[in-house]
Amino acid sequence: MEFEEIRPYHDEELPQVFEELIADPAFQQVACAVMPGVPFEAIAQKMRASKTKQEFQENLCYGILHKLAKDTTDGLILESMAVLNKQSAYTYVSNHRDIILDSGFLSVLLVEQGLDTVEIAIGDNLLIYPWIKKLVRINKCFTVQRALTMRQMLESSIRMSRYMHYTIAEKKQSIWIAQREGRAKDSNDVTQDSVLKMLAMGGDGDIITNLQELNIVPLSISYEYDPCDYLKAQEFQLKRDIPDYKKTTDDDLLNMQTGLLGYKGRVCFRMASCINEDLDELERTLPKPELFVA
């Protein structure tokens, strides 16, 4: 199947994956650290009782995210201009502040509005260990493939765009994706042209029609305090001073841990309306470069 390499798990695959995770000492250690005081046997029991990805999120993830919001923020709020149809699926495109919690907190806020959690675009550079790759696929993540040749990157972008169009149109499942590759180290949140071009690759119409099929909803995420600010500043400086600098696996793990557990102050998600009507106002005959800038 076209999407086998990048898709989340199907529900019928979960029992085997749960057993593999339960038997993994590294996963056991992380699970007990995230849920202190809860015996791992109780965690394993909740996993085995989950028959779907949705049930897994309800039984385990929702409570963890609520606790993280309580312990590490001074409040989590959603300000919305959008009137969302609960029968429709949307593509939430946001700035990127935290590797895990951007999409995690968004899902909590959507559930509180009576909406479904989102499928999440995640870079394969973050899938450092087998247990991480399994866990994110349980949590409705699909993979953005990195470190490819130019030709492979084009093929990967087309496949991912087709998957996103399929997910919105056929699965009726909303999606979250960041507006750029990686977090903005200088907080200059500019949407990358390459992301917009990728989104438009998957449909059968023109650029405007293809983008409209995704029901794009712009989203802004604000943390009063960024627990990873010093790590971002350090990386920004290293990239400036060392042209071939690359983050290590340990760097990624430290960023994930610090982002999860660090103090954030007030956290606000601001949601605009779906941009389909705005796209209708654009001149479809404009050259591609001008369309993406518009």
How does the language model describe each region?
Residues 1-90, 96-107, 111, 133, ...:
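Membrane-anchoring hydrophobic helices of lipid-metabolizing enzymes
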Residues 49-55, 129, 147-150, 284-292:
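Intrinsic-disorder/low-complexity, polar/charged segments
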Residues 2-10, 153-294:
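Non-catalytic C-terminal accessory region of glycerolipid acyltransferases
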Residues 74, 116, 137, 212, ...:
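Residue-level signal for beta-strand positions within conserved beta-sheet cores that form or flank
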Residues 15-25, 59-66, 90-91, 114-124, ...:
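Short, mixed-charge, low-aromatic patches
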Residues 48-51, 62-65, 92-94, 114-116, ...:
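N-terminal start-of-chain detector that recognizes signal peptides
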Residues 27-40, 61, 84, 116-125, ...:
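Short N-terminal helix-initiation segments at or just after the protein's N-terminus
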Residues 77-173, 180:
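Glycine- and small hydrophobic-enriched segments that form the cores of compact globular domains
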